[in-house]
């Protein structure tokens, strides 16, 4: 029997006997998931996973091996669950396991594929669209936490969000659907709350998956929208009245949603920037994701630590409308203040007042630099934040009371004006150059790395979801490209993530080759439907993305991205060729995709080879230039350092003082130029050759670390030579 890994253990609150009893009573649960002592555990692929609803798989790595290394209590819940699972496996015969679908046998296996046909599962809600002829428009538009978010398009061109759990968790989606049904029945639908239709079976890669379907909100998340709105205000595109009036409009809309939920006795528990989407067409904010909802007075299933109200800690008061009001205000504070620039500051900590020093520091040009979460004076805005986030739950206003606060009552603008400003922000002149404005953080790369390791573990147990891993890899290539451009992630982490991606491609190729010997086994053959769906939902989006990449002008900094894209195309070809050899006639559609992949690979190879040859040529030129500087570099560097350390600096003065200052500077410049006079022509010729090369090399990160070091050395030498060449023009 394979060992069982424990992740996310916790102090004991249940006996071994009760754990056995719990499993025996609930062995028919469809997911291998347990709820013990208010904590949820997920069991899949021979692992017992403590379900952490805030960060999903990124936190599952906590506690791995602690049980078996003796570092945790022998009587902890996780150990009890492990003993229970071992006992269950020993006491359940192989024959019985094979006869029990979705029961104990699935506690030790991979997520089974549903046998239900495509379409609605059960009765959808009133007004649900017809799913006959639906297709996958976008696979994994988002992949956050425990869910895949894909886009399904009906034959009438209506776009629906399909929320698919990464592991066996039908119960979670069903519970979320039931919450929406209860709200619709009790309080009615709300224009600023997600519009859900029901559970359905949808295509996903080469599988069929059960998903919660809802209307797509085409737009941006809260942080992106308000960041762009703030930029428009700073650039003078809108005035202060329009900016703050729009903020107040958003606050009123979100508080109207929390009031609506309260009428149904439901608490959201996870309102945050990522769960508020602004509709591009209407400008309206829409609250999404009731996955962590609870009834009023109950302990929440989970929360996001940096936004939650203080009363939601373990063992404290239950969730309420007032805790949702807290979430709305901490969300607004996060977006207004720009807390993403400093992840050490949490929005639920509120504003910090500073009176002993300026609330804003100045940059080198004398302009104020905003410090997130810092306030220097009291205003209606700061009082609003403090009156919500700085008081206990008993003293905190509910939704309607919060809407009457002076900050939200004064200085408002009419709704149509606010919505027009938001629509312009999302679609008009105020839009940023790219709609993908969310920065890639170190935490995001760690989460993606954990997801890749999960796929690698599945490959080791011969349970790899080929469509899922290739779709995730396509998403990760985009994320890594963006992280390299932004420069906000340590280069060692980027290098490690890049290595993990390339390793995953090698594992996929080995996995496919290892399965080739099984192609005569009918159980491993892929149906024409699944092959076609794989091409449409996995291959097609990758081809379109890479083709756009190929149409762009590239620099040396793009070599790493092109290498990864080339590997992605190679792997797609390997997988598709293998699928084409599994006994089924090769369709014209398959031939078409194979030809397109091959053509894209050839074009990409040509561009990559050209760039690599140009880079090798640049390296040779760089080496020659650095060697040329050897005759003057040390003397020039020392002369310039002496000039900088001895020249008089005058910030202000009369015309007479300014003239004296200029005479002194000219004297110092003459001395410095005399020291390097024999190298003047060499330095001038050096800069003529080095500046075009530096432009070609750029400033971005490059795969060749030695080349980066040499580039920066050339940049320093060019700066020295340029400054010395300018001294005569500037001062003499």
Swiss-Prot record:
This is Protein kinase YpkA. Its EC number is 2.7.11.1. Residues 136-408 form the Protein kinase domain. SMART domains: S_TKc (SM00220). The keyword ATP-binding applies. It holds the Pfam family Pkinase. ATP binds at residues 142-150, 163. Gene3D superfamilies: Rac1-binding domain, C-terminal subdomain, Rac1-binding domain, N-terminal GTPase binding subdomain, Transferase(Phosphotransferase) domain 1. GO terms for molecular function: ATP binding; protein serine kinase activity; protein serine/threonine kinase activity. The keyword Transferase applies. It catalyses: L-seryl-[protein] + ATP = O-phospho-L-seryl-[protein] + ADP + H(+); L-threonyl-[protein] + ATP = O-phospho-L-threonyl-[protein] + ADP + H(+). InterPro entries: Kinase-like_dom_sf (IPR011009), Prot_kinase_dom (IPR000719), Rac1-bd_C (IPR043119), Rac1-binding_domain (IPR019093), Rac1-db_N (IPR043120), Ser/Thr_kinase_AS (IPR008271), Ser/thr_kinase_yersinia-type (IPR003547). It is found in: Secreted. The active site is at 270 (proton acceptor). Keywords: ATP-binding, Kinase, Nucleotide-binding, Plasmid, Secreted, Serine/threonine-protein kinase, Signal, Transferase, Virulence. It comes from the Bacteria. Belongs to the protein kinase superfamily. Ser/Thr protein kinase family. Coiled coil: none annotated.
């Amino acid at each position: 029997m394979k060992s069982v890994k424990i992740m996310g253990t916790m102090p004991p609150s249940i006996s071994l006997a009760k754990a056995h009893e719990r499993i025996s009573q609930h062995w028919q649960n469809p997911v291998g998931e347990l709820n013990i002592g208010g904590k949820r555990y997920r069991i899949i692929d021979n692992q017992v996973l403590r379900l952490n609803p805030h960060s999903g798989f990124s936190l599952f790595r906590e506690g791995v091996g602690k049980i078996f290394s003796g570092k945790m209590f022998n009587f902890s819940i996780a150990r009890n669950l492990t003993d229970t699972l071992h006992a269950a496996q020993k006491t359940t015969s192989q024959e019985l396991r094979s006869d029990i679908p979705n029961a104990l046998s699935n506690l030790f296996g991979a997520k089974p594929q549903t046998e239900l046909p495509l379409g609605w599962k059960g009765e959808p809600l009133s007004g649900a669209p017809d799913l006959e002829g639906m297709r996958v428009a976008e696979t994994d538009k988002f992949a956050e936490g425990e869910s895949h978010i894909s886009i399904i398009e009906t034959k009438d061109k209506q776009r629906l969000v399909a929320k698919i759990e990464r592991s066996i968790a039908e119960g979670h989606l069903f519970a979320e659907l039931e919450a929406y049904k209860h709200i619709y029945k009790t309080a009615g639908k709300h224009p600023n709350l997600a519009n859900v239709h029901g559970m359905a079976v949808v295509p996903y890669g080469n599988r069929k998956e059960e998903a919660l379907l809802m209307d797509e909100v085409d737009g941006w998340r809260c942080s992106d929208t308000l960041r762009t709105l703030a930029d428009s205000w700073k650039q003078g595109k809108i005035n202060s009245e329009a900016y703050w009036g729009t903020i107040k409009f958003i606050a009123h809309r979100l508080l109207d949603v929390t009031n609506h939920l309260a009428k149904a006795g439901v608490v959201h528990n996870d309102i945050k920037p990522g769960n508020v989407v602004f509709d591009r067409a209407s400008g309206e904010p829409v609250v999404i994701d009731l996955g962590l909802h609870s009834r009023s007075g109950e302990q929440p299933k989970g929360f996001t630590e940096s936004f939650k109200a203080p009363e939601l800690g373990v063992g404290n008061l239950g969730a309420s409308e007032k805790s949702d009001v807290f979430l709305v205000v901490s969300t607004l504070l996060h977006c207004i203040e720009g807390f993403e620039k400093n992840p050490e500051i949490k929005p639920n900590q509120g504003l910090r007042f500073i009176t002993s020093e300026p609330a804003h520091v100045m940059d080198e040009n004398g302009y104020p630099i905003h410090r997130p979460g810092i306030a220097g004076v009291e205003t209606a805005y700061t009082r609003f934040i403090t009156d919500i986030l700085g008081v206990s739950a008993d003293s905190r206003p509910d939704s309607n009371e919060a809407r009457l606060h002076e900050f939200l009552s004064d200085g408002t603008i009419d709704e149509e004006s606010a919505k027009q400003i938001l629509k312009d922000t999302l679609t008009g002149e105020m839009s940023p150059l790219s709609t993908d404005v969310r920065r890639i953080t170190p935490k995001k790369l760690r989460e993606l790395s954990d997801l890749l390791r999960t796929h690698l573990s599945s490959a080791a147990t011969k349970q790899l979801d080929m469509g899922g891993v290739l779709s995730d890899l396509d998403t990760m290539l985009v994320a890594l490209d963006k992280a390299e451009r932004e420069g906000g992630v340590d280069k060692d982490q980027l290098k490690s993530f890049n290595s993990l991606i390339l390793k995953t491609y090698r594992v996929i190729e080995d996995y496919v080759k290892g399965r080739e010997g099984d192609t005569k086994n009918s159980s491993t053959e892929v149906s024409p439907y699944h092959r076609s769906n794989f091409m449409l939902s996995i291959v097609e989006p990758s081809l379109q993305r890479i083709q756009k990449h190929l149409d762009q002008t590239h620099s040396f900094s793009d070599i790493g991205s092109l290498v990864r894209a080339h590997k992605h195309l190679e792997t797609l070809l390997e997988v598709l060729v293998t699928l084409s050899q599994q006994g089924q006639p090769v369709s014209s559609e398959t031939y078409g995709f194979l030809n397109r992949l091959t053509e894209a690979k050839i074009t990409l190879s040509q561009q990559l080879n050209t760039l690599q040859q140009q880079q090798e040529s640049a390296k040779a030129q760089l080496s020659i230039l650095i060697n040329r500087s050897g005759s003057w570099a040390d003397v020039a560097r020392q002369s310039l350092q002496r000039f900088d350390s001895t020249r008089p600096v005058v910030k202000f003065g009369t015309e007479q003082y300014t003239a004296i200052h200029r005479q002194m500077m000219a004297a110092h410049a003459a001395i410095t130029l005399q020291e390097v006079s024999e190298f003047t022509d060499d330095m001038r010729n050096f800069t003529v050759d080095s500046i075009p090369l530096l432009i070609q090399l750029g400033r971005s990160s490059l795969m060749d670390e030695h080349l980066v070091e040499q580039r920066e050395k050339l940049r320093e030498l060019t700066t020295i030579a340029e400054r010395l060449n300018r001294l005569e023009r500037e001062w003499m």
